[in-house]
């Protein structure tokens, strides 16, 4: 926090930690977080889910249709059901018929893209505001709220003070940044965001603290041993993929219902694959996935709200690289020392020589961050041992 606050003061780029940037980043984090959690549930039960992108597409279309017909809450339910349909197709293909899991995921992505386009032609063409590539707008927006006292929310009709907003306006060292970040996280919050955040601790508790979670993880670590102990691996993989599909569908629903008010072709924009990157970055752990999703969401938020601040972010990266360089030397990690040194040199040169960032590079920032994170991810990654390996019950292994 001290580093980013120093960078903000040095470069006079208040947008780096403004409530607008953080609020936008939070909204953009939600679908990536849910996509990452969808990948977690699938791979923890032993099945690769490359089809998250397609399940999100099902969710965007079904959610927008439900919101158009019945309102946003029903729309979110339809989004979950749409994603679960994709999860069920993937389960039948990979668990029942042992089709290659990567091929099945790719086919689901293609089927979703062309399938919803066909449905749009049947349902939306000729309707007011609709067409082959978009749906009519939803009936009303999903409710949002502000936290009382902190961000000006109401208590029994009384409008409370906006303490964090006041603190942000002071722009004091560290405190002003905390005010901007805090207000961005507590002002104009959608209930869909709350649901997405709750998914993280609930998934952690279910997967690591319940009998069901233990059995599901065992089907991804050692299905043969699990079967010998009486665990129904096939059934658990169906459950895992249905949950995975539901979360992916909900991720798509937040795009067409919360981030927008209608379905639009190409709305997912590769977020399903970025979600898979957050899963790897997070080492197949919910807390790590949330950290990765926040990183990608912030990168996209800066791109949309504070594109003029991207050059200032080079200085922030350089400062972080110095700290990472010192840490790597202390831990005697040669590869990480080299990575930190290269990152420092590139970011320092970019900060000193680049005045404006080309629009094409600005638009690709989230994907550049994805590549950097995957290239520098912890080498001690431990995926589920049998994720992606076909399993046939009752056969000798």
Name each model-derived stretch.
Residues 1-6, 151-157, 203, 221-235, ...:
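Cytosolic-side transmembrane-helix boundaries in multi-pass membrane proteins
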Residues 41-62, 95-108, 215, 238-239, ...:
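Short, non-helical or kinked segments that cap or interrupt transmembrane helices
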Residues 20-76, 80-106, 276-289, 376:
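Single transmembrane alpha-helix segments in multi-pass membrane proteins
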Residues 43-47, 86-169, 209-211, 267-270, ...:
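Short loop segments and helix-boundary regions at transmembrane helix junctions
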Residues 184-262, 286-287, 291:
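Helix-loop-helix "hairpin" substructures at the membrane interface of multi-pass membrane proteins
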Residues 113-207, 263-266, 309, 358, ...:
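Transmembrane helix-bundle core of multi-pass membrane transporters
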Residues 13-24, 121-124, 207, 211, ...:
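Inter-helical junctions in multi-pass inner-membrane proteins, predominant
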